[in-house]
Amino acid sequence: LATLTDVAKKANVSKMTVSRVINHPEQVRDELKELVYEAMRELNYRPNAAAKALANKRTQIIKLLILEEMDTTEPYYMFLLTGIANELDKYAYSLQLLTRNNVQIGDSDGFIVCGMRKEDEELIKNLDKPVVLFGHNEMGEDFIDSNNEQSMAKATQYAIEEGYENIVYIGIDIDEPFAHAREKGYTKVMADNGKEACTYTLGNRSRYSAAFIKEHWNEFQKNTLFLCASDRLAMGVVREIKEQNGNIPEDYGVIGHDGVFLDQIAHPHLTTLKQSITEMGAACARMVLKKVNQDGKPQGNQLFETELKRGGTTR
């Protein structure tokens, strides 16, 4: 088995540096940390988590608290968990998965919280450890999220440049920052281009968007693009346009948001705004560990840009 001395030799650093990378990574430069991590990977060196926890008076556990219902039909949380777990593993940390009913079971060094809504503010405030939220919030907590406003602004500008005469926004009917930001990105670009915004909000289910298209089909002229706040909504729109014998993408365009899985099983594949879910998961892990190592010092927020991924639903 490889030892700490072996890692130090491989990375061409002192044993003290290796120990500091393992126990106090916030005190080491990123380039030096990567050298040590690379040596640890090559030698398959695993720090003794129990010894590390004892030395630091810590549990070496981060809790992931998921406050919304997880949908087993799409791997959104699988990508997020992969990013968090892989990053925590670099620092000899374990991940404990929780729901709102078992928040206080066991001890930990910090929390990553997903799916928080406004009614959860009191629950978050009562957590007695450093907290990082996955998703924009307005209660002053540190968070990681996509740049939702810029994401929809980019898609709206793309639709205009592709020559779509009418651009209809179908948002998610929820009073949360991410939903407002996405709609704002659309309305701002429409106004900047002298176009009239046309917005609707629906529950985030494909059957709702399909029913909406069916009900309003005669109101939508050819050369209309439907900009949807989720791939779920986009799938329902595509399905019903085809049901109404509309031509996609020649006469009607559709853009979704998320790019996790549903865009690939839609026919044709959706043009969508792909979020960097795994990378954002890793960023959540880095931020909460930094916060733990700095005695809860606020870390601010980090926004990730989305990628406009072209499929078969736009020209």
What feature does the model see in each segment?
Residues 1-57, 315:
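N-terminal helix-turn-helix DNA-binding module of bacterial transcription factors
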Residues 2, 61-157, 216:
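Alpha-helical recognition/docking segments in bacterial nutrient-uptake
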Residues 214-315:
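Flexible loop/turn connectors
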Residues 165-167, 196-197, 248-253:
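Short acidic capping loops at alpha-helix termini that bridge into adjacent secondary structure
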Residues 76-90, 154, 177-196, 236-240, ...:
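Short, solvent-exposed amphipathic alpha-helices that sit
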Residues 144-170, 179-181, 188, 206-214, ...:
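Hydrophobic alpha-helical segments within soluble ligand-binding/sensing domains
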Residues 81, 88-99, 169, 187-207, ...:
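Short beta-strand elements in bilobed, periplasmic/extracellular small-molecule ligand-binding domains
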